[in-house]
């Protein structure tokens, strides 16, 4: 569960991200800016997901750091984390990059970084191909270059996620 909050008063909250490694229900509190924070709370199999999105259960977790007078819930949403790594990123005139080619759990913060690296590796190749300086085979090398990197980060993110989600 993620909960985005807007604050009137943030005196008791730090300007950095905090991980609470609770054995039963880990919580991450992310610094967004001076007036906003995101809370990420693990949903347990025994939890009623529909009930969890209501404000009363949410405030139960938020009350550890804030109260209703100092903050407003702007958004709450259930997320599922998973890993996806496509086997083929290039076919005919279609080239995959970023989340369409690979999806990483958020535990290392490398998902968008990997997408940016994909685009950087692809941009000069596409320019060369468009100007007839590179062949379609040269475009295909893009996956061979990027695949080992994203594969390693996805595996590492999944392992870090196991530690953070099951600290006991």
Residue ranges of each PLM-predicted region?
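Core Rossmann-like FAD-binding/catalytic domain of the broad FAD-dependent monooxygenase superfamily
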Residues: 1-168
